[in-house]
A protein has these predicted regions:
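Extracellular/periplasmic helix-exit of transmembrane alpha-helices
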Residues: 109-123, 161-163, 167, 274-297, ...
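N-terminal alpha-helical transmembrane segments of multi-pass membrane transport
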Residues: 1-132, 272, 276, 493-500, ...
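Membrane-helix boundary/coupling elements in multi-pass transport proteins
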Residues: 165-169, 197-217, 330-352, 406-435
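Membrane-water interface regions at transmembrane-helix termini and the short interhelical loops
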Residues: 2-10, 34-49, 68-87, 136-143, ...
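Helix-loop-helix module between adjacent transmembrane segments
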Residues: 7-32, 65-67, 102-106, 143-214, ...
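Loop-to-transmembrane helix boundary motifs in multi-pass membrane proteins
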Residues: 9-27, 182-191, 228-245, 249, ...
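Membrane-interface loop-to-helix entry segments
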Residues: 50-53, 60, 193-201, 207, ...
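Flexible loop linkers connecting adjacent transmembrane helices
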Residues: 2-8, 40-46, 73-91, 115-138, ...
Length: 550
């Protein structure tokens, strides 16, 4: 770390922290007091947002795949993000950023997503038909696959490059915007950007936490007969929060890294159990068919606007999902940046887009196809239960059908708790880093700051449950905030392209691959003009050396 980094003052942006908390709790109070009005307003917002921005959102997600893979396969994909060896093993690294990008509600959707597509299918298929059932898991693969993770990768790479290569200070969204545009991170624009990010993180995590708490308490009630009450949900949330707070307080290496291993290995082993002791042949066959259907119809699924129809499926599912992933992207980018020092751009892109997609395809393929099989053979009418009683009831019934069903339900609940704690840890880190100014490479927010945000992130969902504020309204608000993030990610991407051209356009591919440029020695901490001059001198020297040895 250079002397400039060491002398940089690190402090908490109290104005940003207080303002964001005021906005969050006022919003919760408003949702509780004006619940009916907020539901109507939210429905109008959602309808307008998904209708007007259908084509831009679809194109954004589709082009994100093209750009990220193009970057990975180009010479720029060989650029190393920071000096030295990677801080974490490849497995730990992948586990951690996967958990930063998906919440514990993934376990909920893993059993039920297909049922929604069966009832309201895409590609103009008849509802609840054989064709709709055939494409149901394929659409689930599509919405959790390449496009989604490419959005995460697109947001992450520019921040990684700014922080680890350009050595720009501050691990926040506003910091990279400052590096690209010149707008100060502590100015009006910078604080507005970070405020939107914080509100979005609170909203997204609250939705995931409340949904998990509802699912957990319902299954717990089926197992033990404990009443599914407000206090039961609060106890569950507090238990998760204690685990989350301990993990966050002890730091990334002792906390998040261990939790991520526990969760990912636990989920994989649970899925293997379902695969082996469930309808193995059906799960394998339908997973393969669903993957092929997704692959062969990928462009149609990506750009299906349904201009001759009402476009309802595209608006309510594909556009909704892409906006949901976009709303999470800045937070994921902050966390990925923190754990990716020493990796190359290509490694980050492939690990996120391929690793994240394959991981979710495996989990969704096993859980959803077990659910589909149970529906086809009349064991559990998942679509009907989903519509009439709620998804958490359907999950409980599905788990109870497994061999050693009650034991599997307990294990599922345990995985869900640790999953949620790990995800909250990642979000808590991103939030505390955003409110901590002056962070340089290798520095983290203080343990006390992380602990404070643990408490705040816990209070909001409890307040939502207690006040009976409509969760769908907060979901809509979170989705709507994704629109500005599209612009912000595009600005970040513009900055990334500009930096890559300035820094490496004239550098041969083999020199990048050999890591012939020591980032500190060539002056990446200097001005851009000085940096460009040093790069030219280094390039000229390497050419002379090649001539002498040839």
């Amino acid at each position: 770390m250079d002397m400039d980094n060491q002398n940089t003052k690190i402090y908490t942006d109290k104005f940003l922290a207080v303002t964001s908390l005021l906005f969050v709790f006022i919003s919760v109070a408003g949702l509780a007091i004006y619940s009916q009005e907020s539901i109507k307003i939210a429905a109008t917002w959602m309808q307008w947002t998904t209708s007007v921005f259908t084509t831009p959102v679809l194109l954004f997600a589709f082009l994100a795949i093209i750009f990220t893979f193009g970057l990975a396969f180009s010479k720029y994909g060989k650029i190393k993000l920071g000096e030295g060896k990677p801080q974490y093993s490849t497995m730990s690294w992948i586990f951690m950023f996967i958990l930063s990008g998906i919440g514990s509600s993934t376990l909920y959707w893993g059993f039920l997503d297909w049922a929604y597509y069966y009832q309201t299918p895409g590609l103009s298929l008849p509802p609840e038909s054989a064709e709709a059932l055939k494409y149901s898991v394929a659409y689930s693969f599509f919405h959790s696959g390449l496009s989604a993770w490419a959005i995460y990768a697109l947001a992450s790479i520019s921040l990684c490059y700014s922080y680890h290569v350009r050595k720009n200070k501050g691990l926040s969204l506003a910091s990279v915007i400052e590096a690209v545009t010149g707008f100060k991170s502590t100015g009006v624009v910078g604080r507005l950007v970070d405020l939107m990010f914080l509100l979005c993180m609170f909203g997204a995590l609250t939705i995931s936490l409340v949904l998990t708490a509802v699912t957990f308490t319902n299954i717990l009630s089926q197992l033990t007969g404990i009443p599914n009450t407000f206090m039961t949900k609060v106890i569950i949330i507090l238990a998760v929060s204690v685990l989350f707070a301990l993990s966050s307080y002890v730091g990334m290496d002792k906390g998040m890294q261990r939790l991520s291993h526990m969760v990912c290995l636990g989920v994989v082993l649970f899925a293997i159990y379902v695969l082996c002791f469930g309808p193995t042949q059906f799960i394998l066959n339908n997973s393969l068919m669903s993957f092929v259907l997704m692959a062969t119809n990928f462009v149609d699924m990506s750009l299906f606007t349904d201009p001759m129809g009402d476009g309802k499926f595209t608006r309510e599912w594909t556009v909704f999902y892409w906006l949901w992933w976009i709303s999470y992207a800045p937070g994921v980018a902050l966390f990925v940046t923190r754990v990716s020092k020493g990796r190359t751009i290509k490694e980050v892109i492939f690990a996120m887009v391929i690793g994240g997609s394959v991981g979710l395809w495996f989990i969704f393929g096993v859980f959803e196809n077990y659910s589909v099989y149970s529906f086809i053979h009349g064991a559990v009418n998942v679509p009907q239960i989903l519509s009439q009683q709620g998804g958490e009831v359907a999950i409980g019934q599905l788990l109870s059908l497994l061999p050693a069903g009650k034991l599997m339900m307990w294990i599922f609940l345990g995985i869900m708790v640790v999953f949620l704690a790990a995800h909250m840890d990642a979000v808590g880190y991103a939030v505390s880093a955003t409110c901590t100014r002056g962070l340089s490479e290798g520095q983290d927010p203080s343990p006390n700051a992380r602990l404070f945000w643990c408490v705040m992130l816990t209070l909001v969902p409890i307040a939502m449950i207690f006040s009976k504020a409509p969760l769908d309204t907060m979901k809509t608000a979170t989705i709507v905030t994704a629109l500005p993030f599209i612009v912000i990610i595009l600005i970040q991407t513009y900055g990334l392209v500009k930096w890559l051209i300035q820094d490496y356009a004239k550098v041969p591919s083999h020199l990048i691959e050999q890591q012939g440029y020591d980032d500190q020695e060539i002056g990446l901490n200097q001005t851009q003009d000085e940096h460009a001059k040093r790069m030219q001198l280094e390039l000229a020297s390497s050419i002379k050396l090649d001539r002498k040895t040839s």
